[in-house]
């Protein structure tokens, strides 16, 4: 891959093809990009804004190089937020997952350590004494006996270990915040997503339609990636997803 040519195109505000961003992600997992190049890539795309095809390509790359999780469960949901809203709230999506599981619905929660916030889903789960695992038998037992399973992203998405420190060092959220919600290795049939702004809502509508799952997307107009009581909020959904 000609990384210099890729950067020149990004500097000219050109969009990359889905297959190109997939190859970029795979190159990152192979260690073919150094930290400076990865930081430059994250910054360039953040400044221009990511397209639907680019986001799907990065998703393809993460799933292609990651560890799949074929859960032995008919139907389950993931509840997640993009993060990066700078509101410093507690982990609302993670909390909601336990409420949903308590109500009798199966949940496959996918998350990671904090990148742009104080506490990520994995920080919360770990601090409550849960040991992360990639053992499929244990994961299946968790979702079928407890109604919820937690999938720590770094055990399944190899790319995360290459970008984690860089994301933490950058003073702004990157497209990896947008990738997080759509790279659950168990590929849930339904997802409830909180986004920080209406541009993200429109982006994910197109992404989910191409992925082909039932979904609900929520956004508070004052910038929370949750349904908030601090002001009006918007909800969009498709399929059998109910909000």
For the regions a language model picked out, list residue spans one by one.
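Glycine-rich anion-binding loops and their surrounding alpha/beta cores
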Residues: 9, 64-67, 89, 104, ...
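Acidic, glycine/proline-rich low-complexity segments that act as flexible tails and inter-domain linkers
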Residues: 1-88, 103
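Core alpha/beta catalytic barrel or barrel-like domain that forms the active/cofactor pocket
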Residues: 70-80, 108-114, 176-179
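Hydrophobic pocket-lining residues that define ligand/cofactor binding sites across diverse proteins
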Residues: 45, 100, 208
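A generic, well-ordered mixed alpha/beta core segment in the N-terminal half of proteins
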Residues: 81, 85-142
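Conserved active-site and cofactor/substrate-binding residues in soluble primary-metabolism enzymes
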Residues: 1-2, 15-23, 32-40, 50-57, ...
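Short beta-strand segments at enzyme active-site cores
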Residues: 37, 108-110, 217
């Amino acid at each position: 891959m000609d990384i210099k040519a890729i950067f020149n195109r990004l500097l000219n505000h050109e969009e990359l093809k889905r297959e190109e961003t997939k190859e970029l992600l795979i190159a990152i997992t192979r260690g073919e990009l150094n930290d400076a190049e990865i930081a430059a890539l994250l910054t360039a795309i953040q400044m221009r804004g990511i397209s639907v095809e680019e986001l799907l390509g990065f998703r393809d790359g993460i799933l292609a190089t990651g560890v799949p999780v074929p859960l032995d469960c008919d139907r389950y949901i993931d509840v997640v937020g993009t993060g990066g809203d700078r509101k410093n709230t507690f982990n609302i999506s993670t909390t909601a997952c336990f409420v949903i599981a308590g109500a009798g619905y199966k949940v496959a929660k996918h998350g990671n350590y904090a990148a742009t916030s104080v506490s990520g889903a994995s920080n919360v789960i770990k601090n409550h004494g849960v040991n992360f695992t990639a053992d499929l038998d244990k994961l299946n037992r968790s979702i079928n006996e407890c109604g919820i399973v937690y999938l720590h992203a770094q055990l399944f998405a190899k790319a995360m270990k290459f970008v984690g420190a860089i994301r933490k060092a950058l003073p702004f959220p990157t497209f990896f915040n947008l990738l997080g919600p759509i790279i659950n290795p168990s590929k849930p049939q339904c997802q409830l997503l909180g986004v920080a702004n209406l541009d993200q809502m429109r982006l994910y509508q197109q992404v989910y339609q191409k992925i082909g799952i039932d979904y609900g997307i929520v956004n508070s107009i004052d910038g929370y990636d949750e349904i908030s009581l601090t002001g009006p909020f918007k909800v969009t959904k498709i399929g059998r997803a109910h909000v």
